[in-house]
Swiss-Prot record:
<keyword id="KW-0546">Nucleotide metabolism</keyword>
<keyword id="KW-0378">Hydrolase</keyword>
<dbReference type="InterPro" id="IPR029001">
    <property type="entry name" value="ITPase-like_fam"/>
</dbReference>
<comment type="similarity">
    <text>Belongs to the Maf family. YceF subfamily.</text>
</comment>
<dbReference type="GO" id="GO:0009117">
    <property type="term" value="P:nucleotide metabolic process"/>
</dbReference>
<keyword id="KW-0963">Cytoplasm</keyword>
<dbReference type="InterPro" id="IPR003697">
    <property type="entry name" value="Maf-like"/>
</dbReference>
<dbReference type="Pfam" id="PF02545">
    <property type="entry name" value="Maf"/>
</dbReference>
<feature type="active site" description="Proton acceptor">
    <location>
        <position position="69"/>
    </location>
</feature>
<comment type="function">
    <text>Nucleoside triphosphate pyrophosphatase that hydrolyzes 7-methyl-GTP (m(7)GTP). May have a dual role in cell division arrest and in preventing the incorporation of modified nucleotides into cellular nucleic acids.</text>
</comment>
<protein>
    <recommendedName>
        <fullName>7-methyl-GTP pyrophosphatase</fullName>
        <ecNumber>3.6.1.-</ecNumber>
    </recommendedName>
</protein>
<dbReference type="GO" id="GO:0047429">
    <property type="term" value="F:nucleoside triphosphate diphosphatase activity"/>
</dbReference>
<dbReference type="GO" id="GO:0005737">
    <property type="term" value="C:cytoplasm"/>
</dbReference>
<feature type="site" description="Important for substrate specificity">
    <location>
        <position position="12"/>
    </location>
</feature>
<feature type="site" description="Important for substrate specificity">
    <location>
        <position position="70"/>
    </location>
</feature>
<feature type="site" description="Important for substrate specificity">
    <location>
        <position position="154"/>
    </location>
</feature>
Length: 192
């Protein structure tokens, strides 16, 4: 088996990948994550996932490189990482009582052959009706400033949900393991 490399500095993605009990290393790719003019969100996350994997291919020949990227979408609006307390509160108040789609792009690049599998795994969350006080308490408690949509589904963020819908709950955290296992299997990796 070629060595696995996770093209991410995200602790959340490392924790998810560790669930597969496969040895792996990780490195942070340096790419421009700006959305292209008119680029649909699905194509954005697919492109960025692939670019993250490709960015590390030169320094990691003969690896299986996993790239992933996620955006939250409310209607037609792409919600990025809020980075500030105020913006996180604004995002959550905008999403209150609404359905938010999380699109997670996934790429598995075999840097020895150049073959790359790419997909987008959607997951939908309907948020409860939230008051400003609830939102501010949540953001203060969990500090979801580096999370698309301003919440951490793997933590207290689940308390904001009214319902969820999707094929792979791990995609909500940023690395869709069910789809990744399919991709790894096509590369001859046995899981479990």
């Amino acid at each position: 088996m070629l060595p696995l490399l996770l093209a991410s500095s995200s602790a959340y993605r490392r924790e998810l990948l560790a669930r597969l009990h496969l040895p792996f290393t990780w490195a942070s790719p340096d790419i421009d994550e700006q959305r292209l003019d008119g680029e649909p969100p699905v194509e954005l996350v697919r492109r960025l996932a692939r670019q993250k994997a490709e960015a590390l291919a030169g320094s990691h020949p003969r690896h299986l490189i996993i790239g992933s990227d996620q955006v939250a979408v409310l209607g037609e609006q792409v919600l990025g990482k809020p980075h500030t307390f105020e913006r996180a509160c604004e995002q959550l108040l905008e999403c209150s009582g609404q359905q938010v789609s999380f699109l997670t792009g996934l790429a598995l690049l075999n840097s020895a052959t150049g073959q790359c599998q790419v997909d987008c795994v959607p997951f939908t969350v309907t948020l409860r009706e939230l008051s400003r006080e609830q939102v501010e308490r949540y953001v203060a408690a969990e500090q979801p400033l580096d999370c698309a949509g301003s919440f951490k589904a793997e933590g207290l963020g689940v308390s904001l949900f009214q319902s969820t819908h999707g094929c792979d709950a791990t995609s909500l955290i940023g690395l869709p393991l069910i789809r990744l296992v399919d991709m790894l299997t096509k590369e001859g990796v046995m899981v479990p």
